[in-house]
């Protein structure tokens, strides 16, 4: 393990980052909010990260939290695409509005995530 992509600061998504960093001091923790434990690289809308053969586009999707980031990942070897949405999008709906509002959620779901190619797998 070289890198952790953290969608937001809530304990169920970032709570283990510090322990992982203790076990792997060279671990690179990426996220969009200074409140993320062990954060080493802060990203925002449009930032790009490369991990091995994966190209990652950061999508700023505030609402569940003000610093929420979704990660759109493309495998350059086989072209497969996936988006890691954290608590922005669930199979049966969207995440709760802890720090944002309906307009932000609409932007996140219908503009940013809605613009992704149909073949994108959501996780």
Located regions from the model:
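Active-site HxH/HxHxD metal-binding segment of metal-dependent hydrolases
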Residues: 1-60, 74, 81
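Catalytic core of the metallo-beta-lactamase
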Residues: 39-123
């Amino acid at each position: 393990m070289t890198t952790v992509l953290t969608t937001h600061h809530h304990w169920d998504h970032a709570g283990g980052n510090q322990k992982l960093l203790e076990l792997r001091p060279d671990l690179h923790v990426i996220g969009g909010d200074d409140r993320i434990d062990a954060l080493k690289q802060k990203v925002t809308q449009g930032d790009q990260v490369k991990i091995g053969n994966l190209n990652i586009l950061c999508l700023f999707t505030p609402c569940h939290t003000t610093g929420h980031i979704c990660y759109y990942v493309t495998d350059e070897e086989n072209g497969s695409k996936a988006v890691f949405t954290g608590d922005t999008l669930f199979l049966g709906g969207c995440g709760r509005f802890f720090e944002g509002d309906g307009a932000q959620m609409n932007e996140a779901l219908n503009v940013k995530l809605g613009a992704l190619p149909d073949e994108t797998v959501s996780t």
